Design a protein with these regions (language model features):
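Membrane-proximal helix-turn-helix segments that form the acceptor-binding/catalytic region
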Residues: 71-79, 118-138
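A short, active-site helix/loop in glycosyltransferases that binds the activated sugar's phosphate group
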Residues: 136-158
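Acidic anion/phosphate-binding donor-loop and adjacent secondary structure
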Residues: 150-151, 164-181
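Nucleotide-activated donor-binding/catalytic signature segment of Leloir-type glycosyltransferases, i.e.
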Residues: 216-245, 250
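Acidic donor-binding loop of glycosyltransferase active sites
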Residues: 245-260, 275-276
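Conserved acidic donor-binding segment of nucleotide-sugar-dependent glycosyltransferases
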Residues: 291-304, 311-318
Length: 355
């Protein structure tokens, strides 16, 4: 089976592996790509990414839609058994182009961002309905998005499939030999509510010798420059981040509320590494954390709730945090491993192509 994959990011094509680049962002010669590498033999995956940085890509970023990528995919669509687009930025444009022709393979669109950020209004919604009037297949990583489609795009609901996100649990593993540094770690460069976390940490009178490391939002440093216990860092390479994860006593992933998928990679990687965690209960996280044995859930924007959760984690012994952290790993590996996601996606693709 020939699959054309159009991700909404740039894929680096490498002759040799580079550990500084995460798997979705790289394709190494002679190796399978991302979750497709677990597909059985007989599948060929070609990639058309969003392209290198240019003035035109800057324009696409402003209008929040990709143009060149879906046009390239449209031109070669009939060379493939299925086109899989990751993200509506190009998926909607590709689907719009295909709606005017008869000859086309089936189209599976990963809807990560709720089509247009899950906004419903008199301007965008009719345009989206028009673009999707031929009803492509849609994959989401949070179950509440299925309800969103039932309510606002009922004609598409039967073709929406919830498949949980998965991370590489053989790569993200506990590192018990790494010495702890009495730190709390949070990381992520987008869609984080670090203000709630920092405010909650600031209100704790007895910080028990803890420092909070915030990776990914250095611009907040001026706001909290009166607190030596909060350290802000820019985005760092993955190996360095994993070292900080291993050194931390526990991890916090503070999330704002949106009606789509975000933050899942971060908290599942943390759980796979055997870390106790505090995670905000949002549309994106509820499917994954409600039954997680080593996660304390906090409501969005709840500073007092975050403060109590931090104090609860701080008051645990190292042995207690290690125990619930390893329970998190068992939970994540049994439900949210990348291989399980790959199998579910492969089965769905076969169902689409073969009827």
């Amino acid at each position: 089976m020939k699959i054309l994959f159009t991700p909404n990011w740039t894929v680096h094509h490498l002759d040799a592996d580079d550990d500084l680049i995460q798997p979705p962002d790289k394709q190494v010669v002679g190796q399978g790509y991302w979750f497709f590498k677990y597909f059985p033999k007989g599948y060929q995956v070609d990639i058309i990414d969003r392209g290198r940085k240019s003035w035109f890509r800057d324009l696409e970023k402003k209008i929040k839609f990709y143009i060149k990528q879906p046009i390239r995919a449209f031109k070669c669509r009939n060379d493939y058994d299925i086109v899989v687009s990751h993200g509506a930025q190009s998926g909607l444009v590709y689907e719009l182009l295909c709606s005017f022709v008869k000859n086309k393979p089936p189209h599976l669109m990963f809807d990560i961002g709720g089509l247009n950020g899950a906004r419903i209004n008199h301007y965008e919604t009719p345009l989206i309905r028009f673009a999707l009037r031929k009803c492509p297949y849609i994959l989401v990583h949070t179950s509440r998005q299925v309800d969103f489609y039932r309510e606002h795009y009922p004609e598409l609901a039967e073709k929406v499939r919830f498949i949980p996100y998965g991370v590489d649990c053989k790569y993200f593993v506990p590192q018990p030999s790494v010495e702890r540094t009495r730190t709390i770690l949070t990381f992520g460069k987008a869609k984080r509510d670090n203000v709630t976390l920092c405010e909650a940490f600031a209100r704790i009178a007895d910080k028990r010798g803890y420092r909070l490391i915030v990776v990914g939002e250095p611009e907040l440093s001026k706001r909290y420059d009166y607190l030596d216990e909060i350290i802000f860092r820019s985005v760092i390479p993955l190996p360095e981040l994993m070292q900080l994860m291993a050194e931390s006593d526990f991890i916090v992933i503070p999330l704002p509320e949106f009606l789509y998928s975000y933050g899942q990679m971060s908290f599942l990687q943390s759980m796979a590494m055997g870390k106790a965690a505090i995670i905000t209960r949002t549309t994106s996280s509820r499917d994954y954390i409600e039954k997680a044995p080593g996660v304390i859930g906090v409501e969005p924007y709840d500073i007092d709730g975050m403060k109590h959760a931090l104090e609860e984690m701080m008051d645990m012994t190292d042995a207690q945090r290690d125990a619930i952290g390893m329970a998190n790993r068992s939970y994540a590996t049994s439900r949210y491993d990348e291989r399980e996601m790959s199998k579910a996606i492969c089965d769905y693709i076969n169902e689409i192509v073969n009827g």
